[in-house]
Amino acid sequence: MNQHLAVITGCSSGFGLLSTVELARQGWTVVATMRDLSRRGALDESVSRAGVGERVSVRLLDAAAHPTHAAFAEQVLADYGRIDLLVNNAGFAMGGFAEDLTLDEYRYQFETNFFGAVSLTKAVLPAMRKQRSGRIVNISSIAGRTGTPAMSAYNASKFALEGYSEALRLEMAPIGVYPILIEPGSFETGIWYHKENVAAAAADPNSPNAVRTGRFRDYIQKTLHRADANAVARLIAHVASVPSPKMRYPIGTDAKMLLALRLLLPWKVFETLVVKKMGLGL
């Protein structure tokens, strides 16, 4: 049994898969979770290729199935005796202009991106408090720091996660438990490719935003391949063990540039630049 135990959500692809392999390579025991075990093939292949199979346990967990989280944490503790790191990675991006999104679509976005992270965090906090140590890495986004057209549901869920993480950090840091935010920019993770993650009204040619929705999709496709997602996995492994972790870690050239523009430019100038760059003018 390894001394360091990590629980990671959303491990069938993207940051979850890559961080599972990276942490296991560095000696961690990893409980890698996903909501559909039939999609574990890519993770199993990556783990096998890296030669870290003995350090990875793949388990069923739906981040949006909140009533199951306490029992899941209890089982992990029964099996391993401790939880040193929780990576709340599971999430998705609900696309669509605010005018087209329904309240149910907003709720659907929040169930995983926000309430899922809160529920799992609550499930592991008692063990971390008892240990007087632990890290909770919440995978946020640059979208949690500045609004993005056609992404208001995603923005809102990540802004909520940022505020929650700040408050939790102030509450838990004095006892040795450190919530940490990682804020990626545009990385290739597959998060944008699911049709169910787009507002139903976005497919309606009669939507007042039909043309602009098409322009936004084109923009997203052009910016997806900017950076290697392994950089985020390496950052997760770094903050898992660095002695004094920061509150926030923006990552990606575009994330840092957007943050700088948002902080330095007057709102009207920033607004004009974003609308023009994304081709969202009427």
Whereabouts are the PLM-identified features?
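Substrate-binding pocket helix/loop in short-chain dehydrogenase/reductase
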Residues: F97-A98, E105-R107
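Conserved glycine-rich cofactor-binding loop
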Residues: S12-G14
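Residue(s) in the substrate-gating loop at a strand-loop-helix junction
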Residues: S141
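Active-site helix of classical SDR
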Residues: T121, S157
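C-terminal beta-strand-loop-alpha-helix "lid" module of Rossmann-like NAD(P)-dependent dehydrogenases
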Residues: A173-T223
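The beta1-alpha1 cofactor-binding region of Rossmann-like NAD(H)/NADP(H)-dependent oxidoreductases
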Residues: L60-A71, L103
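Active-site loop immediately N-terminal to the catalytic Tyr-X3-Lys motif
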Residues: E99, T146-S152
